[in-house]
Amino acid sequence: MNLTEYSHILFLSLCTLNFCLYSINSDDNGGWERGHATFYGGADASGTMGGACGYGNLHSQGYGLQTAALSTALFNSGQKCGACFELQCEDDPEWCIPGSIIVSATNFCPPNFALANDNGGWCNPPLKHFDLAEPAFLQIAQYRAGIVPVAFRRVPCEKGGGIRFTINGNPYFDLVLITNVGGAGDIRAVSLKGSKTDQWQSMSRNWGQNWQSNTYLRGQSLSFQVTDSDGRTVVSYDVVPHDWQFGQTFEGGQF
């Protein structure tokens, strides 16, 4: 990187800090807020697989290349996993590419308190930052920009098919990974019910979108209630058959 490029990135970084701390009034601007974005994961986004939401292979789970790791201020301890955001690069015509993208939250961008917020600590609180999969970033900005100011807002997630439930764990510890959630995309609460009981049991978030139950459920068909952050609930009755096995994935209803 030559001196001119370094000076540009340093200047942009300082401007970006001021940019991201200013919030747009959502009532006047359709919910748009301001933040900033960088990229990671390589040209093929292979470095974005896995992540703090627990989705694993983002291609097989349907999230693909349009993904983002969120800073602490946005990630909310995993509660925003699966949420969809529209982003557009703003206020830098030299590096911005017109148009917007929609990305899903699939990972956490951890803070780095050894670095200043305006000089490498992009994901430090209270900054609202998106570390985008590289192919997604390149749709709104040039590679050499490194970091750009963005406008962003929550948007509904459009998904094909139903909500997916992947059953992991052991007979006395069921860990259910929930993916492909439409609507708000992120989940507020999950309950399950075995076919041998009339009672719904609340599940607890273990990490990301992995939800746990300590109830013995082998030999029972399973039903799920999923409530998103908008407060809407989808019930998938007997979506898991009685002869289910750990490692299997089942598809239920959708928002």
Swiss-Prot record:
Which ranges carry the Expansin-like CBD domain?
Answer: 172-252
> Topologically, how does it sit relative to the membrane?
Peripheral membrane protein
Keywords, A to Z, come to: Cell wall, Cell wall biogenesis/degradation, Disulfide bond, Membrane, Secreted, Signal
Q: Which GO terms describe its cellular component?
A: extracellular region; membrane
Look up keyword Cell wall biogenesis/degradation and say if it applies. yes
Signal peptide positions are: 1-26
Q: Name one GO biological process term.
A: anatomical structure morphogenesis
Q: Which Pfam families does the annotation name?
A: DPBB_1, Expansin_C
The UniProt record lists the Expansin-like EG45 domain at 50-162
Q: Which CDD domains does this one have?
A: DPBB_EXPA_N (cd22274)
Q: What is its main location?
A: secreted
The listed locations are: Secreted, Cell wall; Membrane
Q: Which cysteines are joined by disulfide bonds?
A: C53-C81, C84-C157, C89-C96
The protein's role, per its UniProt record: Causes loosening and extension of plant cell walls by disrupting non-covalent bonding between cellulose microfibrils and matrix glucans. No enzymatic activity has been found.
The record's PANTHER family line, in alphabetical order, gives: EXPANSIN-A15 (PTHR31867)
The family annotation for this protein states: Belongs to the expansin family. Expansin A subfamily.
**Name recorded for this polypeptide:** Expansin-A2
Q: Which species is listed as the source? A: Arabidopsis thaliana
Q: What is the lineage of its organism?
A: Eukaryota, Viridiplantae, Streptophyta, Embryophyta, Tracheophyta
